[in-house]
Amino acid sequence: MKWRHDYMAEKKVEDLEMDLNEEELEESEVNEDKEFEELDKSEEENEVEELISTLKDENEKLNNEMEALKDRLLRTTGEYDNYRKRTDREKEGLYASACEDVLKEILPVLDNLERAILAKGDIEDLKKGVDMTLKQFKDSFKNLGVEEISTENGFDPNLHDAVMHVEDSQYGEKEVVEVFLKGYKKGDKIIRHSMVKVAN
């Protein structure tokens, strides 16, 4: 019996050792799992920190680019405003200069008309004065680059306004029969179309 008792005791010791080994093994596995979890957490934390750092750098870079673009936009807007103001002043100056040039040409004609009204004399003297004033007007127009629109080459809808049409065998088709109001142009720009009567 002793033998059996020793066997049982030995078996119990083996079972206890086995239980202890299993517990140690489980504890070791749990510790390893904890270490792996800590390693995983540590690696994840490092990755997250790197990602946060990268995103912060990119955000700072984008903010710098945005500030540079804002500054560029403000400068461009300011330059455009200055350009617009400068061109407005130049236009006003050109307009004033053009008006001044026209007035300088026309004022002497006005002076002569006033003198003609004040002059004492007969009809022939008055007619001679009006003819001279008319010549002076035409010279002023010539100096300003303004010329009368010709009707010698026939009717041209780009230059003439046909206010009347006539059937007359003495005139060719589209020939200007009569000028009611002379037209004028400066270069290629029409100031006023000639008002004419045209043959059909």
Curated annotation (Swiss-Prot):
Segments for region (Disordered)? 15-47
Q: What are the recorded Gene Ontology BP terms? A: protein folding
Q: Where is the composition biased (Acidic residues)?
A: 16-47
What Gene Ontology terms describe what this protein does at the molecular function level? adenyl-nucleotide exchange factor activity; protein homodimerization activity; protein-folding chaperone binding; unfolded protein binding
Q: What is its main location?
A: cytoplasm
Can you tell which superkingdom this protein's organism belongs to?
A: Bacteria
Extract the InterPro entries matched here: GrpE, GrpE_coiled_coil, GrpE_head
Task: State where the protein is found.
Answer: Cytoplasm
Pfam families noted in UniProt: GrpE
Listed GO cellular component terms? cytoplasm
Q: What does this protein do?
A: Participates actively in the response to hyperosmotic and heat shock by preventing the aggregation of stress-denatured proteins, in association with DnaK and GrpE. It is the nucleotide exchange factor for DnaK and may function as a thermosensor. Unfolded proteins bind initially to DnaJ; upon interaction with the DnaJ-bound protein, DnaK hydrolyzes its bound ATP, resulting in the formation of a stable complex. GrpE releases ADP from DnaK; ATP binding to DnaK triggers the release of the substrate protein, thus completing the reaction cycle.
Family recorded in the similarity comment? Belongs to the GrpE family.
Give the matching PANTHER family: GRPE PROTEIN, GRPE PROTEIN HOMOLOG, MITOCHONDRIAL
Oligomeric form and interacting partners: Homodimer.
Q: What's the protein name?
A: Protein GrpE
